[in-house]
């Protein structure tokens, strides 16, 4: 439970456990992952059925770890988060966003021969799947030195699994509609899932 600021700081009160409906996304998980290290005690966060949001949770953990925060993965989708931690400032290079770049990549697949820069091939971003899906539709994808070039070819229908990358489903649906033949996008929804938080 989070209480209002007192003397410039937030006072957090511990509770045994609670559940959060995750059917509308992972925002609550992200907030908890950022807040729990500041508690006076240790916490355990468990996500049931992360489904189509797994990569977004892992990106959050990667970001707070870079700030000096320790997060211990006890088993699949369960993390122990020690308390009394402090965030530390650091310098870093921000990689390009595959979710936003997906629009440009799809434009390239539809006939505009587009090159998108500053997209790292080594990333936890699930939306990097846009490259795999465009190739499945028949587009030509070339990668070199953090540059991605997408060229049009004769697009055809395909079955595209949106597991772990639902944010790019809308732009892929539009692209597939302009391809020849039938396409099917699976696992586009966010199933009802719950987050369990335990504070000893």
Task: Locate the predicted segments by residue.
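Short, structured segments at the rim of ligand-binding sites
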Residues: 1-197
